[in-house]
């Protein structure tokens, strides 16, 4: 029969401690502090002076962490212990420890009012150390007679074996594997100390993943499964730029943490220009990390669909064109064929000597096909067009509010998985989703639809950059806008040092980036809420001073209505902030200073090459949600 000393020597040490062994009489009557998370077992005999070993275990039913202190003596007889707090204060009830005939078991008997509660502690010769609460002698006997069941060290469920370095259940094994393989990034809504057990393990993925890693599950084990051994090859000089990436930290909390690190495939630091040939196009698409984040009220409405990328929308348009018999030139057919093949970027078309005018003609072809399809399937389209023409001469009174709760909620679902290295594809895809969401938001406003197709398209063409900039400010935290802009500036500086860009070009783009950053920061400082963002967008959308608009007086009335509702909301919601409305409205002129062409280069050239956003706006406004919602990103939590 093994002694307690032999058993204790096998316990995995987490810390060594000399624990005070006083408070013998008080400890037998004191109650356990319910708020204490960690407790200790201390020998109650004042004359016992032996070293002790400490192991932290977790009660799977309560999730409470318990420190078990085992006395190292040679007697092997029952010993009396006391449950105390980690600092030795607030002693609790007495525990009697005895060794079972089985060499791998030590029982800690806790007397209480309901009877004898048995705390069964398994020693390390059994693979999983754990505590089981046995309420009576019968259950104790049953537990001794049946084979010992291993418990998951993460949640306390029945373990299926050792996975990635720790004994876990199938659920925690799969969760850890998915999290590491896809490099998922979670957030904790609490204080990062959530209880993780069999019943609550799915409530906080962040704390569950942290617990997996803290209890010995190794990320490297999963990485080795999915990452093949790479054979070192000699790369030619012309492909060096395409293999460079920007490393982005996932725990960014401030602009100081947004410093980017440039590495190549062999992890050798070097720099390159992001702004040559449509700026960011030369960065390789790479890496996997995930972050699905939800902002604003959790309402599933028409304007909150999970939006696909700009390239996928164009692909959807090309697929629609296949159903029409419209004659096309060889150039247009080649472009449409390239789109239909599922290419994720149109930048390749520019590299294949396809000019922007040819791409634009292909879009014009798609527009004609869509118009033909609409005319053949909807007999009411002519009626809608005639009604729209009436608006050129008649001002329509708008009944009810301009915006309702559907238009206040503004949810952006980020691309998933998030890349380990910030790259052009992730930046452009994130921006395209924000652009789609802004377009779809505008289209969902009934007053906007009443303007007619041509007028509504003209409005969006004139103000899409303002709507996009407001969306960037609203989603700045979700998109890590500061990090993206910091990467832009860093690469601009490197490009200028290597004479890849003229100083005038660098200054122009840098000024634009700083204006955008200043605008986003000012909106964050004002703590603008969802209602205020919605009304600011409406005021920017219904601007009657853009050239080429028809029925300007009606558009002006819509803007006035948006302003009046905005004023009413701010007055009622922030009665003590007298100048809040003025401060918010004074941010709008800064949007007019944003250069739309530079915004296109920075955020969209990586997906659509030299195609201008203005040429794509009509198709986005004309499409149904189902047409560009083909890729379900997943529900944001």
Curated annotation (Swiss-Prot):
Q: What is this protein called?
A: Nuclear receptor subfamily 2 group C member 1-A
The reply to whether Zinc-finger figures as a keyword in the UniProt entry is: yes
Q: Where are the zinc fingers (NR C4-type)?
A: 152-172, 188-207
Please list the residue ranges the record marks as binding DNA: 149-224
**GO biological process entries:** cell differentiation; negative regulation of DNA-templated transcription; negative regulation of transcription by RNA polymerase II; regulation of transcription by RNA polymerase II
Q: Name one Pfam family in it.
A: zf-C4
Q: Which purpose does this protein serve, as stated in its record? A: Orphan nuclear receptor. Binds the IR7 element in the promoter of its own gene in an autoregulatory negative feedback mechanism. Primarily repressor of a broad range of genes. Binds to hormone response elements (HREs) consisting of two 5'-AGGTCA-3' half site direct repeat consensus sequences.
Q: Give a GO cellular-component term.
A: nucleus
Superkingdom per UniProt: Eukaryota
Q: Which residues form the NR LBD domain?
A: 383-624
Q: Where in the cell is it found?
A: Nucleus
Q: List the disulfide bonds.
A: none
Q: What is the originating organism of this protein?
A: Xenopus laevis
What's in the keyword line of the UniProt record?
Activator, DNA-binding, Metal-binding, Nucleus, Receptor, Repressor, Transcription, Transcription regulation, Zinc, Zinc-finger
Similarity-based family: Belongs to the nuclear hormone receptor family. NR2 subfamily.
Q: A Gene Ontology molecular-function term?
A: nuclear receptor activity
């Amino acid at each position: 029969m093994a002694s307690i000393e032999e058993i204790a020597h096998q316990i995995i040490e987490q810390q060594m401690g000399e624990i005070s062994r006083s408070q013998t009489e008080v400890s037998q009557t004191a109650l356990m502090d319910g708020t204490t998370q960690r407790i200790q077992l201390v020998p109650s005999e004042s004359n016992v002076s032996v070293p002790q070993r400490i192991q932290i275990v977790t009660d799977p039913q309560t999730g409470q962490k318990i420190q078990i202190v085992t006395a190292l003596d040679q007697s092997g007889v029952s010993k009396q212990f006391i449950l105390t707090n980690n600092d030795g204060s607030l002693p609790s009830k007495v525990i009697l420890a005895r060794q079972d005939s089985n060499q791998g078991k030590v029982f800690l008997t806790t007397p209480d009012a309901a009877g004898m509660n048995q705390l069964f502690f398994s020693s390390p010769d059994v693979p999983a150390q754990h505590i089981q609460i046995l309420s009576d002698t019968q259950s104790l006997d049953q537990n001794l007679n049946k084979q010992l069941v291993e418990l998951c060290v993460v949640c306390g469920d029945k373990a299926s074996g050792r996975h990635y370095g720790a004994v876990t259940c199938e659920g925690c094994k799969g969760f850890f594997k998915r999290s590491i393989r896809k490099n998922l990034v979670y957030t904790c809504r609490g204080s990062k100390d959530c209880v993780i057990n069999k019943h609550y393990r799915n409530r906080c993925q962040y704390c569950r993943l942290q617990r997996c890693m803290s209890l010995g599950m190794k990320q490297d084990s999963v990485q080795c499964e999915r990452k093949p051994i790479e054979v070192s090859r000699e790369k030619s000089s012309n492909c060096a730029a395409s293999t460079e990436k920007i490393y982005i930290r996932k725990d960014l909390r401030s602009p100081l943490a947004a410093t980017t690190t440039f590495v190549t495939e062999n992890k050798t630091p070097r720099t390159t220009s992001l702004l040559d040939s449509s700026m960011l196009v030369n960065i390789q698409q790479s890496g996997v990390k995930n972050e699905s984040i939800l902002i604003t009220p959790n309402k599933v409405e028409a304007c909150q669909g999970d939006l696909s990328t700009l390239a996928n929308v164009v692909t959807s348009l090309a697929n629609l064109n296949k159903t029409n018999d419209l004659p096309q030139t060889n150039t247009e057919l080649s472009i449409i064929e390239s789109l239909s093949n599922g290419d994720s970027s149109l930048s390749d078309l520019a590299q294949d000597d396809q000019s922007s005018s040819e791409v634009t003609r292909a879009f014009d072809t798609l527009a004609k096909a869509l118009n033909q399809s609409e005319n053949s399937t909807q007999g009411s389209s002519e009626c809608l067009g005639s009604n729209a023409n009436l608006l050129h001469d008649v001002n329509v009174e708008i009944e009810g509010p301009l915006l309702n709760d559907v238009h206040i909620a503004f949810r952006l679902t980020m691309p998933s998985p998030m890349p380990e290295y910030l790259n052009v594809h992730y930046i452009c895809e994130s921006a395209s989703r924000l652009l789609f969401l802004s377009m779809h938001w505008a289209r969902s406003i009934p007053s906007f639809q009443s303007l007619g197709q041509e007028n509504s398209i003209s409005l969006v063409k004139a103000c899409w950059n303002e709507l996009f900039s407001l969306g960037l400010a609203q989603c700045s935290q979700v998109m890590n806008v500061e990090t993206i802009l910091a990467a832009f500036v860093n690469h601009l500086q490197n490009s200028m040092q290597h004479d890849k860009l003229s100083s005038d070009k660098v200054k122009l783009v840098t000024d634009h980036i700083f204006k955008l950053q200043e605008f986003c920061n000012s909106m964050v400082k004002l703590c603008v809420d969802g209602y205020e963002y919605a009304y600011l967008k409406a005021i920017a959308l219904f601007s009657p001073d853009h050239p080429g608009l028809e029925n300007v007086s009606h558009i002006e009335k819509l803007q006035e209505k948006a302003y009046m509702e905005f004023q009413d909301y701010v007055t009622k919601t922030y009665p003590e902030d007298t100048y809040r409305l003025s401060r918010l409205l004074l941010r709008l002129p800064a949007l007019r200073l944003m250069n739309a062409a530079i915004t296109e280069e920075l955020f969209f050239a990586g997906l659509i090459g030299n195609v201008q956003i203005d040429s794509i706006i009509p198709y986005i406004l004309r499409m149904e949600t189902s047409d560009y919602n083909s890729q379900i990103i997943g529900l944001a939590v």
